[in-house]
Amino acid sequence: MSAQPVDIQIFGRSLRVNCPPEQQDALNMAAVDLNERLQDLKVRTRVTNTEQLVFIAALNVCHELAQERLKTRDYASNMEQRIRMLQQTIEQALLEQGRISERQDAQFE
């Protein structure tokens, strides 16, 4: 579907953005999250300049995203290593099973 204009409130300001209908709930949740972050920053930093608060919030979000990417990359690397170990274990078990079968076949000949 095509994007529809949606009005959201960010830090007391109205903003109209285009958004596909199926993503409007996610957009609204993101707006709520951003508002909460901005309010929290305003209290913690005592910065009153909205533009500065927005930049600080953007930097914080970028930092969090970078941290999550690192976690995901580490997790994927760990899973790849475990999969390789499992493959080696399975291959070794199959080789041993093949040797056992060969010995049993040789005994019956």
Curated annotation (Swiss-Prot):
Primary location recorded for the protein, binned into one broad class: cytoplasm
GO terms for biological process, alphabetical: division septum assembly; FtsZ-dependent cytokinesis; septin ring assembly
Protein name, as recorded: Cell division protein ZapA
Originating organism: Serratia proteamaculans (strain 568)
Subunit text: Homodimer. Interacts with FtsZ.
Keywords (A to Z) from UniProt: Cell cycle, Cell division, Coiled coil, Cytoplasm, Septation
Protein's cellular compartments: Cytoplasm
Matches recorded under InterPro entries: Cell_div_ZapA-like, Cell_div_ZapA-like_sf, Cell_div_ZapA_eubact, Cell_div_ZapA_N
Family from the record: Belongs to the ZapA family. Type 1 subfamily.
PANTHER family: CELL DIVISION PROTEIN ZAPA
Gene: zapA
Listed GO CC annotations: cell division site; cell septum; cytosol; plasma membrane
Protein task: Activator of cell division through the inhibition of FtsZ GTPase activity, therefore promoting FtsZ assembly into bundles of protofilaments necessary for the formation of the division Z ring. It is recruited early at mid-cell but it is not essential for cell division.
Coiled-coil ranges from the UniProt annotation: 71-99
